[in-house]
A protein has these predicted regions:
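Beta-propeller domains with acidic blade repeats across secreted/periplasmic ectodomains
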Residues: 1-353
Length: 353
């Protein structure tokens, strides 16, 4: 059950495995793992696979990021930082280093929790968290309280140390030492991953509750509308007569809400990537890719400036479901019903270039 992946400077693919998830907890008795895949002879096929680290503490880690010999693993409630000191691709506690980089993220064994770390062109680290919320402190001593009506966190609606009130899911950045954290966007339902381009633009995708999944442009500092601004109410409590579900869920008629972007209905968006070079050919430069396992597809976009944001026109970049029929995500049994093989042929968790 690969949950997230990253590719290092040597072309090795690092993958987190999420076997011990919820009712399957304990299935892998030694814990979940981070695995390294290699093509050692350059023929384009994986011929080597080894476990970098396996720990009982790892339970469905939803993110991995690799920077030279430093590996960040997102495993709620912690971001764990491993340093492979001898660079042998195997974590040895007698030689290598392990530290809890940041902590305080809600909720273990939940997909609306801590997601993957990724880098920005500014040299900072970025990560997202779902609407389970978080109360975490950076290494500068600043505490951020981001709660909501999903888990009814006691700190919902409380000010963070920077003086702002943040609710719902969020995107944050921090410097490589863990200092000077910032909240860049908030009030998502459950943004699995985001990306920051070399021009500084940010994009993300967001799980829905009813059929209103979206891929969006992140305008820094903005609210994406899921909870009320004090975090006390979910969107249904404030739905106005005549509003569609996407308009109400993402509060598109409320002042201060960020434009929802491409709202495409039911699904379960996960990994996202942006192509900036010609690795996939010249036509792929500027291509935004977003995984949608619920619809058996990796969506593609070429973001085009429009007003203060971007126009996002969706197309199928890679799919096994050419008719576009939505057969259901895991929460409605889509992954467990084998009567139609379309549901199990292609359920992409992540995409990297």
């Amino acid at each position: 059950n690969p949950a997230n992946m990253d590719i290092d400077h040597a072309g090795r693919v690092w993958v987190t495995e999420g076997v011990n998830y919820r009712r399957h907890s304990g299935r892998s008795r030694e814990g979940d793992c981070v695995r390294v895949l290699q093509d050692t002879d350059g023929d384009g096929k994986c011929d080597s696979s080894n476990v970098f680290v396996r720990e009982k503490e790892l339970e469905c880690p939803l993110g991995v990021a690799v920077f030279d010999n430093v590996i960040f693993v997102s495993n709620t409630p912690n971001i764990i930082k491993y340093t492979d000191v001898n660079r042998d691709l195997k974590f040895d506690p007698a030689v290598d280093k392990r530290e809890v980089f940041l902590s305080g993220f809600e909720q273990p064994q939940h997909d609306h929790s801590l997601h993957s770390v990724y880098a920005g062109p500014d040299g900072r680290l970025y990560f997202s968290n779902g609407n389970c919320g978080a109360e975490f402190s950076d290494k500068s001593g600043n505490t951020f309280r981001i709660g909501g009506a999903y888990l009814n966190n006691t700190y919902a609606g409380a000010k963070s140390d920077d003086g702002h009130v943040y609710v719902g899911g969020f995107t944050a950045s921090v410097d490589p030492s863990g200092h000077k954290a910032k909240i860049l966007g908030f009030n998502y339902r459950n943004s699995y991953e985001g990306v920051r381009t070399s021009f500084g633009d940010m994009f993300l995708n967001d799980n829905d509750d009813p059929p209103a999944c979206r891929v969006s442009h992140l305008i820094e500092g903005g609210s994406f509308g899921f909870f009320s601004r004090d975090g006390k109410r979910q969107w249904r409590a404030d739905k106005r007569p005549g509003q569609t579900i996407p308009e109400a869920e993402w509060r598109q008629d409320d002042p201060g809400s960020i434009p929802a972007g491409d709202v495409y209905g039911g699904g379960s968006p996960t990994g996202i990537a942006y192509v900036e070079d010609s690795a996939l050919g010249k036509d792929a430069r500027g291509l935004l890719l977003s995984c949608e396992p619920g619809r058996n597809v990796v969506f593609g976009y070429y973001p085009k400036p429009e007003g203060a944001g971007f126009k996002l026109e969706r197309f199928d970049f890679c799919t096994t479901n050419t008719t576009g029929v939505f057969k259901g995500s895991d929460f409605v049994g889509g992954a467990n019903n084998l009567s139609d093989e379309r549901q199990t042929l292609f359920r992409p968790s992540d995409v990297c270039v």
